[in-house]
């Protein structure tokens, strides 16, 4: 899985060669921003949650945004809990530090937070702790098969 599955995912749009692998780690928002040479906010981080029952939710948000539990509960109608590292790997096929909404092992519901819309391009990971791709918010929505844009974050405005 992981980087290979993400590259395979991007073949649908002939974009597999746009995935960049770095010599240094891009596993955290801070490392990714430094490695790529952009602000923290332009890193599109993917956060994995368990909803009701076996439902898995992936929320992609700007690197400077934090989940607002009240907004999240209002949006989804329940309190979601973050997945453990083992659950993340099992559900997405990606290790923490490389989680992204592409080339997933299963089909979690993918949501994009509006905190990303303020940028012309953002940089989500690509399945490994040292990879990313530059996408417009529109491309991110299309390539991730996201359900809808949501507003569940704080501290970014």
Swiss-Prot record:
It comes from the Bacteria. One of its GO terms (molecular function) is aminoacyl-tRNA deacylase activity. Disulfide bonds: none annotated. Pfam families: tRNA_edit. InterPro entries: YbaK/aa-tRNA-synt-asso_dom_sf (IPR036754), YbaK/aa-tRNA-synth-assoc-dom (IPR007214). This is Uncharacterized protein YwhH. It comes from Bacillus subtilis (strain 168).
């Amino acid at each position: 899985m992981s980087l290979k599955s993400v590259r395979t995912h991007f073949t649908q749009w002939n974009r597999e060669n746009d995935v960049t692998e770095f010599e240094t780690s891009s596993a955290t928002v801070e490392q990714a921003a430094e490695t790529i040479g952009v602000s923290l906010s332009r890193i599109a981080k993917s956060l994995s949650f368990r909803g009701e029952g076996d439902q898995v939710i992936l929320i992609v948000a700007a690197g400077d945004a934090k989940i607002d539990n009240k907004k999240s509960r209002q949006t989804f109608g329940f309190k979601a809990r973050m997945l453990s590292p083992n659950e993340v790997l099992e559900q997405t096929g990606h290790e923490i530090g490389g989680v992204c909404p592409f080339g997933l092992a299963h089909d979690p519901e993918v949501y994009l937070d509006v905190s990303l819309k303020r940028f012309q391009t953002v940089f989500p990971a690509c399945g490994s702790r040292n990879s990313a791709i530059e996408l417009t918010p529109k491309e991110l929505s299309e390539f991730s098969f996201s359900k809808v844009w949501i507003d569940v974050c704080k501290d970014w405005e």
